[in-house]
């Protein structure tokens, strides 16, 4: 376990920068869309571009990694993500932003697949849940930090977009300078969706439904909070709580999944998430009624924290569960397949 973590520090640091930029960007675009008076339909359309790209990228990434390797793919798509965010500040239009979000989605799914296949290659069935949970802690913790950067400058200025680009570019440094060798699969075996389903029907179906949930939460949370008249600081707090509570949950739930049937842990977490998501909606509607607004917001925060605690660790559990049933030379294809199904659920 310690050896795996020591050999993966560059990947963890690089992904930390990537996710910090992603968290900042997600909130920034949602709030900027409201300030530009995009309609709710236009905003939803624009933000959905990310998952269209996610869906497209997942279908092609195994072949790209097989041809040029993990490090080059990480570097290339990090550079693309860094470039794309700058164009948002120049061309403020829902359709243009949709196309840019498609490119961002392609970039991110390629980066995720590189990172997750790298970690799966380094870990074993005995510690895979714990390793992936630490990875997810870093991801969601970084997202939380990035979301607080929304207070850096007004979303109407160009400076926040430049900062997102700078942070994304910084992710290249540890990856390109590491002495640790990336995975060296002699051959990355293809894996059709049918093969993936045969290997892990539970993992594939779970990935689809997880995509439907997380796409709505991460793309529209800032928009929803803005519509409830939350201040920029309050929006930062809500999005930060989403990420940090999910980060805190990763390791204990991942550790539990290494000790017990991962499927039961996923099912239990799903029920918890459903209950507290419903409570969050009920409490948020109370804010529009006469009464103690501060109490309503506090209850909203608490129920939302527990929802995040239950829901955000699920993808690492799904990935670990699926990889328990396949050989190492199929990790890249299986990871990309799960990302593909996740993207399909996200745009459905």
What is the meaning of each model-derived region?
Residues 2-51, 200-207, 212-224, 228, ...:
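Helix-loop boundary and gating motifs at the non-cytosolic
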Residues 263-316:
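C-terminal transmembrane helical hairpin of 12-TM major facilitator-type secondary transporters
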Residues 329-348:
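A late C-terminal transmembrane helix in Major Facilitator Superfamily
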Residues 150-151, 165-185:
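C-terminal membrane-cytosol helix-exit motif in multi-pass small-molecule transporters
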Residues 110-123, 312-326:
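Intracellular juxtamembrane helix-capping segments at the cytosolic ends
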Residues 72-86, 165, 264-279:
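Structural signature of the two symmetry-related core transmembrane helices
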Residues 57-70, 154, 249-261:
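Helix-to-loop junctions at the C-terminal end of transmembrane segments
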Residues 102-137:
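Cytoplasmic helix-loop-helix junction between adjacent transmembrane helices
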């Amino acid at each position: 376990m310690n050896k795996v973590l020591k050999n993966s520090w560059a990947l963890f640091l690089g992904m930390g920068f990537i996710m910090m930029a992603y968290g900042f960007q997600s909130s920034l675009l949602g709030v900027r869309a409201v300030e530009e008076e995009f309609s709710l339909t236009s905003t939803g359309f624009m933000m959905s571009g990310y998952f269209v790209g996610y869906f497209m990228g997942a279908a092609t990434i195994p072949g790209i990694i097989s041809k040029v390797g993990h490090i080059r793919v990480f570097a290339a798509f990090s550079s693309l993500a860094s470039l794309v965010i700058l164009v948002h500040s120049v061309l403020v239009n829902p359709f243009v932003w949709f196309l840019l979000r498609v490119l961002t989605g392609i970039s991110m799914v390629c980066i995720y697949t590189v990172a997750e296949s790298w970690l799966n290659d380094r870990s074993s069935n005995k510690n895979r849940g714990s390793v992936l949970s630490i990875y997810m802690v870093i991801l969601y913790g970084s997202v939380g930090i990035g979301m607080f950067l929304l207070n850096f400058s007004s979303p109407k200025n160009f400076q926040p977009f430049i900062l997102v680009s700078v942070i994304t570019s910084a992710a290249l440094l540890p990856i390109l300078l590491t002495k640790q060798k990336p995975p060296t699969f002699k051959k990355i075996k293809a894996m059709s969706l049918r093969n993936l389903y045969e290997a892990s029907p539970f993992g594939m179906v779970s990935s689809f439904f997880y995509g439907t949930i997380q796409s709505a939460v991460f793309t529209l949370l800032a928009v929803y909070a803005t519509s409830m008249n939350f201040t920029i600081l309050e929006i930062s707090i809500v999005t930060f709580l989403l990420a940090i509570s999910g980060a805190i949950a990763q390791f204990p739930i991942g550790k539990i999944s290494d000790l017990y049937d991962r499927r039961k842990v996923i099912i239990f977490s799903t029920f918890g998430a459903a209950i507290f998501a419903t409570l969050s909606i009920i409490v948020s509607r109370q804010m529009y009624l006469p009464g103690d607004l501060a109490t309503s917001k506090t209850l909203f925060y608490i129920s939302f924290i527990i929802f995040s605690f239950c829901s955000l660790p699920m993808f690492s559990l799904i990935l670990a569960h699926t990889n328990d049933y396949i050989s190492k030379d199929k990790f890249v294809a299986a990871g990309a397949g799960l990302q593909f199904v996740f993207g399909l659920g996200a745009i459905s």
